Amino acid sequence: MKTIEVVAAIIHQGGRILATQRGYGEWKGMWEFPGGKMEAGETEEEAIVREIREELNVGIRVERKVCTVEYDYPQFHLRMHCFWCSIAEGVLELKEHQSARWL
């Protein structure tokens, strides 16, 4: 089974955590932590910084790795590396998501 490696940012600010709502694809409308697929040659930390810049147009501070979650979908195996992060620079701008909420 094919393994897909992704990264996810658990972005915190003022005691709340950011959730984003997908704006495209099979899971459109579903809520998630922002992130995405790793590219060849990237470290996990490089991937999460790049993905958040692409999706939300902000720079983040990666504070620590929280966990790696593995799950078997019918078509592939998912390996998701989750990081505790904060916004280091910029103002959130949704580039790929249809909505975002601080929870």
Where do the PLM segments sit?
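The catalytic Nudix box helix
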Residues: 33-65
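Conserved N-terminal beta-strand and adjoining loop/helix that marks the start
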Residues: 1-17, 37
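A short, internal acetyl-CoA/4′-phosphopantetheine-binding micro-motif in the GNAT/acyltransferase core
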Residues: 37-40, 88, 103
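Conserved hydrophobic "DFG−1" position in protein kinase catalytic cores
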Residues: 11-12, 19, 85-87, 102
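Active-site-adjacent beta-strand/loop module that shapes the phosphate/pyrophosphate-binding cleft
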Residues: 59, 69-92, 101
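Nudix hydrolase/Nudix homology domain
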Residues: 26, 31, 93-103
